[in-house]
Amino acid sequence: MIGGLCKGKDLIVLKIGENVKDEDGYYTAFKHLTEYCLRFTDNVIVAGTYWKAPKKEEAMIRVARENNLKYVPLFWIYELYEEEVKAHVGDTIYNIKGKPYTIKTDFIITHPNNNGMKMIADEIFKIIML
């Protein structure tokens, strides 16, 4: 599966969940993924969802606690700073290589803009540095 991506890493950050539809099976699936990652490193950080999703968030917190892992709550970013962190049609965002992309459709506007992504990264980085 993702073993090639995990092998030799000293840190794995699990940042998933926003697009998962099966909330009832989320705990089991997330637990399985976490246990798989723990086979490669003990240093796994669980990052919560960007959009409030109580059932998924509860599952991630539970798995983090069961495995004595650090957990980063993130939903508050969108809740408190929605207008500053959500993308708008016409905004320019940048991919990981710095290439600009102008948002042309409504699909992407619910996602974090560059400011939102920076806030997410900053919160995760704070936990890494603990």
Tell what function each PLM region has.
Residues 1-130:
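Alpha-helical cap/lid subdomain in secreted, periplasmic
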